[in-house]
Swiss-Prot record:
Name of protein: Major facilitator superfamily domain-containing protein 8
Cellular location(s): Endosome membrane; Lysosome membrane
Keyword Chloroplast assigned: no
Catalytic reaction annotation: chloride(in) = chloride(out); iodide(out) = iodide(in); fluoride(in) = fluoride(out)
Main location: membrane
SUPFAM superfamilies listed in its UniProt record: MFS general substrate transporter
Regions of this protein lying in the Extracellular compartment: 62-74, 127-131, 195-211, 288-304, 359-412, 473-482
Annotated spans, Disordered: 1-20
Stretches assigned to the Cytoplasmic side: 1-40, 96-105, 153-173, 233-266, 326-337, 434-451, 504-518
Alphabetized UniProt keyword annotations: Chloride, Chloride channel, Disease variant, Endosome, Glycoprotein, Ion channel, Ion transport, Lysosome, Membrane, Neurodegeneration, Neuronal ceroid lipofuscinosis, Transmembrane, Transmembrane helix, Transport
GO BP terms: astrocyte differentiation; autophagosome maturation; cellular respiration; determination of adult lifespan; gene expression; glycolipid metabolic process; glycolytic process; glycoprotein metabolic process
Disease per UniProt entry: Ceroid lipofuscinosis, neuronal, 7: A form of neuronal ceroid lipofuscinosis with onset in early childhood. Neuronal ceroid lipofuscinoses are progressive neurodegenerative, lysosomal storage diseases characterized by intracellular accumulation of autofluorescent liposomal material, and clinically by seizures, dementia, visual loss, and/or cerebral atrophy. The lipopigment patterns observed most often in neuronal ceroid lipofuscinosis type 7 comprise mixed combinations of granular, curvilinear, fingerprint, and rectilinear profiles. Macular dystrophy with central cone involvement: An ocular disease characterized by decreased visual acuity, slight pigmentary changes and color vision abnormalities, becoming apparent in the third to sixth decade of life. Fundus anomalies are variable and include bull's eye maculopathy, severe atrophy of central fovea, relatively spared fovea with surrounding atrophic ring, central retinal pigment epithelium and/or choroid changes, pale or atrophic peripapillary area, pale optic disk, relatively spared periphery, and slightly or moderately attenuated vessels.
Gene label: MFSD8
Amino acid sequence: MAGLRNESEQEPLLGDTPGSREWDILETEEHYKSRWRSIRILYLTMFLSSVGFSVVMMSIWPYLQKIDPTADTSFLGWVIASYSLGQMVASPIFGLWSNYRPRKEPLIVSILISVAANCLYAYLHIPASHNKYYMLVARGLLGIGAGNVAVVRSYTAGATSLQERTSSMANISMCQALGFILGPVFQTCFTFLGEKGVTWDVIKLQINMYTTPVLLSAFLGILNIILILAILREHRVDDSGRQCKSINFEEASTDEAQVPQGNIDQVAVVAINVLFFVTLFIFALFETIITPLTMDMYAWTQEQAVLYNGIILAALGVEAVVIFLGVKLLSKKIGERAILLGGLIVVWVGFFILLPWGNQFPKIQWEDLHNNSIPNTTFGEIIIGLWKSPMEDDNERPTGCSIEQAWCLYTPVIHLAQFLTSAVLIGLGYPVCNLMSYTLYSKILGPKPQGVYMGWLTASGSGARILGPMFISQVYAHWGPRWAFSLVCGIIVLTITLLGVVYKRLIALSVRYGRIQE
């Protein structure tokens, strides 16, 4: 995590010019070092939270089938959605908690919940019946633990100046992206243990390819708690970098500056929540649809789709990290609002390119109508292509666009180059929109406690991750990619219009009240 240190961390955030009185009094070297040590601990917390989510994603379906053969794809949808539901409920609660109590409290409690959830996940083989419901509870608890994202971002926003904000938010997003990338890698490293693995009879613990990743995640969670207790300190600064009093800080000194007053622009707050919802909505539906889309368009087997799309998503994750690094530099020249607008336009172009054109049609699948390409009902079935049991054999399964989907007969094929170009553009625009939404949001809120507001923003993103797959599964199954991606393009156009309407209002609270020049 030390590599994430950037220029804004290396320069003292004090006065505007060296030698001025403000340069000497705004922040001591000891306070500065303590502040950034605390922020880096939260970088690690975000990374570990992302790893905890993604480390089992590729194995949930086969593990669910193993512990409870009665589980079907419809129930799988609830298992996947339970994480986002838990996070959506918990984020505002943890955010409110962090506004009035030391941030260590909600952070430690949330991580303990995640550790407990991982331990429950490792023992899902113990109950004699209803094991699938225990998995539902385990994933829901993990989502509740992930509600600490609101605390992490609100702390970082409150502990950085406007000058440092974009860079620090980019670092958090990079850690989150790295966690999503490396989680499946860790999962792969444990596949050599196999489904049976070994059993520790004394504590009835099965150590196999399904349980080892969550046990590792639980261990890292305990390590994270120790680091939080040892290193994290309460720090708050105003938009200029002056230390502020905080109810979270038990030893606040009397010479610290009071938090500047000013009313938050609620229109701007609501607008950013909508923008953030759409950002996560469109990427969640893209992640969901690429497996059935590629199986329909290119006659890939399920195994090929999982492998190739896994590589594509991993590449998009690496692309996101590079984008975060570039945005930190670009934002200093053209500002966050313009970058957000550019990101939305790039995403729109990406989905527009996905629209099918021409006279060539996909291969039609005439046999085995009950295939896994793209059923037309449940949320769980739409994402079933993301999981594949090692015991399954795809060699004899028919491939192509299922005749059950009437649109296969008249919808042109989406060429592979067309799909890859679109993926690159969406992978470029999404991290930009994600980062700029958080950054602008934190600046609009100003130096006041942001826990509740960050909680609502996180909750809106969680809701988007639930609704996005549900939306795309229904539209794609019934009307095909032309209608599905046309509607997405329309949603993005409306979002760009909203951004244009509120563009001038998306400014920092201190800039709005003239305390700082933009």
